[in-house]
């Protein structure tokens, strides 16, 4: 593995007597796609919420770029270089694709913004939005209201909004949800490209996509880690086959 930029040790989150995430330890390196897979209710989204600071852990630790980040809130986690997308598309539908990305870029400005100064006056913000759209291949769609874009393009816009905040670590929660084969292939190609300059932690149910793009996998069941390893190790793991992959294949 290259330089480890995101690492958890024994990360745990209780809701009352339920351990939604229980003792999860994993590491993600720069230039790596680390996929977290598992059946519904395994704790995958709760794990991402812990990593993004949207939820505080009940126990365990988290490091970002070698420094302790345990229990930090989402704003501080974001400023440390972490961006996330959500399971459900989280965009401003009436606004254009460019305006969505510009809003995201504004959220990372360290200088104060004058209330009566138009957003268009901030060149660095507009440039960040344009770069983000170009990174996801939608530079020609910037002037279109997001409501008029396809579902796949809306998911790309959400990733572009994440990129507009200039993260080094991407937490992506089911970016291929609800997509057809052509749209999925486009997102997989995008993830491959982004992995060259980012660490990506990916939660996804599309196993074809996962095995096409992941460098490492963690399998979760009932909040705990069942197995971790390279794709070929996970694919041949009998416990994983019985608990998850076998059920996935039977359902197809």
In which residue ranges do the predicted regions lie?
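Glycine-rich phosphate-binding loops of nucleotide-dependent enzymes
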Residues: 2-252
